[in-house]
């Protein structure tokens, strides 16, 4: 596989550990939700998302009901766009207050910097909201890496397991699918990207998956333990 025209990467389990998201970010948002909803429910950036949750679930627009719904979604790792937007707002305070800094694998940091130096455009596609993605890379253990990226995509462009989402991303960045490499630890996402012609790499880190995964369709993708093994 030669140097691609652009690289699209997932975050959780790919550039960064699963445990940071599940053991630090998710519990932080869950704890903060009651106060956040009470203090910001009338804020113009918050109210539309709470309205969406209430309308979609038939939940009465009460603080208690909304918080209970959102906390259940956190517990089940829902990818709902409204939840991700609200989580991002909560995490912003955590980053700014120094409550935590984002984890990035050293091999990912090294390769991201090298690709940027080689003028390869880098993009993020994550279920987390675009503001949350930007905060993640701005407040990392390796410093502010947000400037390495040319663009950011979340589920507002479509679900990560839907091939049409990757078609929209390719059209947005103006590069044919065959010129893009997508990096992820989720086989269903890679399958969707491959359907429209993206080159795909399954990242199967031992820190996140102690036993190598033998997944259906894994042979359809380059299967590596880390960014250090990437051939470009």
From Swiss-Prot:
EC nos: 3.1.3.77
Cofactor binding comment, as recorded: Binds 1 Mg(2+) ion per subunit.
First-tier enzyme category under EC: hydrolase
Entries under SUPFAM superfamilies matching the protein: HAD-like
Pfam family for this entry, one: Hydrolase
Listed pathway(s): Amino-acid biosynthesis; L-methionine biosynthesis via salvage pathway; L-methionine from S-methyl-5-thio-alpha-D-ribose 1-phosphate: step 3/6; Amino-acid biosynthesis; L-methionine biosynthesis via salvage pathway; L-methionine from S-methyl-5-thio-alpha-D-ribose 1-phosphate: step 4/6
GO MF term list: 2,3-diketo-5-methylthiopentyl-1-phosphate enolase activity; 2-hydroxy-3-keto-5-methylthiopentenyl-1-phosphate phosphatase activity; acireductone synthase activity; magnesium ion binding
Protein name, UniProt field: Enolase-phosphatase E1
Top-level taxonomy: Bacteria, Pseudomonadati, Pseudomonadota, Gammaproteobacteria, Lysobacterales
């Amino acid at each position: 596989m030669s140097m691609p025209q652009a690289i699209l990467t997932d975050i959780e389990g790919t550039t960064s550990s699963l445990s940071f998201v599940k053991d630090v970010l998710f519990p932080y948002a869950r704890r903060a939700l009651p106060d956040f909803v009470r203090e910001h429910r009338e804020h113009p950036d918050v109210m539309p998302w709470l309205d969406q949750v209430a309308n979609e679930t038939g939940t009465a627009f009460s603080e208690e009901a909304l918080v209970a719904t959102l906390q259940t979604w956190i517990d089940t790792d829902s990818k709902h766009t409204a939840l991700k937007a609200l989580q991002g707002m909560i995490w912003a305070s955590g980053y700014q207050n120094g409550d935590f800094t984002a984890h990035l694998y050293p091999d990912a940091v090294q390769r991201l910097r090298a690709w940027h130096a080689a003028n390869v455009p880098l993009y993020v596609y994550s279920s987390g909201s675009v503001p949350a993605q930007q905060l993640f890379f701005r407040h990392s253990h390796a410093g502010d890496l947000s400037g390495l990226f040319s663009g950011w995509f979340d589920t507002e462009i479509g679900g990560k397991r839907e091939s049409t989402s990757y078609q929209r991303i390719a059209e947005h960045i103006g590069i044919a699918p065959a010129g893009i490499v997508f990096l992820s630890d989720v086989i269903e996402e890679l399958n969707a990207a491959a359907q429209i012609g993206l080159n795909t790499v399954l990242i199967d880190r031992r820190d996140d998956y102690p036993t190598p995964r033998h997944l259906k369709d894994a042979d359809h993708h380059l299967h590596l333990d880390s960014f250090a093994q990437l051939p470009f």
